[in-house]
Amino acid sequence: MKLLVVTILAGLAVCHGATKEEIVATEYLQNINKELAKHTNVETEVSWAYASNITDENERLRNEISAENAKFLKEVAKDIQKFNWRTYGSADVRRQFKSLSKTGYSALPAEDYAELLEVLSAMESNFAKVRVCDYKNSAKCDLSLDPEIEEIITKSRDPEELKYYWTQFYDKAGTPTRSNFEKYVELNTKSAKLNNFTDGAEVWLDEYEDATFEDQLEAIFEDIKPLYDQVHGYVRYRLNKFYGDEVVSKTGPLPMHLLGNMWAQQWSSIADIVSPFPEKPLVDVSDEMVAQGYTPLKMFQMGDDFFQSMGLKKLPQEFWDKSILEKPDDGRDLVCHASAWDFYLTDDVRIKQCTRVTQDQFFTVHHEMGHIQYFLQYQHQPFVYRTGANPGFHEAVGDVLSLSVSTPKHLERVGLLKNYVSDNEARINQLFLTALDKIVFLPFAFTMDKYRWALFRGQADKSEWNCAFWKLREEYSGIEPPVVRTEKDFDAPAKYHVSADVEYLRYLVSFIIQFQFYKSACITAGEYVPNQTEYPLDNCDIYGSKEAGKLFENMLSLGASKPWPDALEAFNGERTMTGKAIAEYFEPLRVWLEAVAVESLCHQRYKNVDL
């Protein structure tokens, strides 16, 4: 590679015009994109090996290859400084060079880079290896987050049992990482400055190519917050009725251990005790899936069928040969958190997921397969463009399908929902169930990165890092931990993405724009006609719509070759992200909640208001 770079750069000496230099630069890009794909493929392979089997040897190999790639990226950064790329006439060439100029953590000195890899590995390994003792059998101490603890948090209605598992998990998943996390923040900041950014927050926000993006999100969140407050208030009202005043206050934040999720990020698991019309059966096809003999493999085959029905790409054989679709039973430690992987070769795409046969996991399968479809659609692009238009786009694609898959119409289509009676009460129940996932998630997602931005920006004193985290959670989500937390604890890294250095804003963006995508796809498919009750947005199924599939193809095939507003425009003609489609989708629920809040004196805000 070095000889190739030198040869190409030598051509600059004989190029006397900008046009000739740009031709040479274009040739350089063609070659360096191929080299980057090769290097990244090797690094991804060892990362896959480590995430699939956490051993000291796999960690050593991953860190070794990552360090080698960091050196390579530094060489690339030096090479591109020799090109006057900012003056070139081709917007595409300038965009590729700009992308290459961002070296990320590779900008760190070798010793710092090695230390960063060590602390990140330590945090990720700590998270993956958490085991707790059984609440009812202290001699049994092999319960892992996925699936044992998550199933208990989802299904138990015993406040003391839930408090026990919450405390045990947070004490082990978060608190031990504090010193490593402090070093991580330090090195993250150093890397940002070496890349000519002020801090790590600016690095993450730069991916969205808009200096006002943070302000835009704040504005959208404020527009959506009244609906969140309504949902929050109603859930608290119902939980208070179920558990009583001693467990759930009528006026304070919600105890997060009662919300059916370890991080209180989505609350659909407690729908059985908070649904507006409990006499109406909730849409949950988990038991039916088991009765029909569903397997993880069948769930993925059905996801593949959905994409193909829209005229999109079929999963390649490599996917089926190399993916991990169930938790291995050989006792190994692995990262069970569902993830999709691109290996930067033709058709080498994989998913690693400890899949269980449940409705929720069925939707997760479609989410992860959205990433895979994106990988396949842009794999013809140069390496630097083989990513989403922005990080949120990548997360949104599969969620659009999940919105469709979760409708009664689609579940009836595939034979999983039987004897379903559709009326207004059933519709409100279904919308409320969706809100417990989609609306509840928004403030959670925002705080995951607002917290880390504050640390990167130095806005929170190190001696108050844990308190700062819980202040944000209460301010934005109106929740609180089940036990008092102090600076002896450190709880943010108890979320996988925080321990693993994964930017979380992508999920907030995804949960906003997926409704824009969904609305446009539904209109195109003839499944949604605004202001016509026969074709409501919340029961739209885009399965089989080649026309909707073409919208996805138009956008996904661009990869990151265009700014995200261009990609959005290719899908639906819009260039801005808004919360209007969310409001449209949930309007019937908003009207119902507004009425019931008055009738039952169910307040919306979680502070200083009485029922």
From Swiss-Prot:
Cofactor note: Binds 1 zinc ion per subunit.
SUPFAM superfamilies for the chain: Metalloproteases ('zincins'), catalytic domain
Required co-factors: Zn(2+)
Domain Peptidase M2: start-end pairs: 19-607
Keywords on record: Carboxypeptidase, Disulfide bond, Glycoprotein, Hydrolase, Metal-binding, Metalloprotease, Protease, Secreted, Signal, Zinc
GO CC term, one of those recorded: plasma membrane
Its biological purpose: Involved in the specific maturation or degradation of a number of bioactive peptides.
Protein name: Angiotensin-converting enzyme
Organism of origin: Haematobia irritans exigua
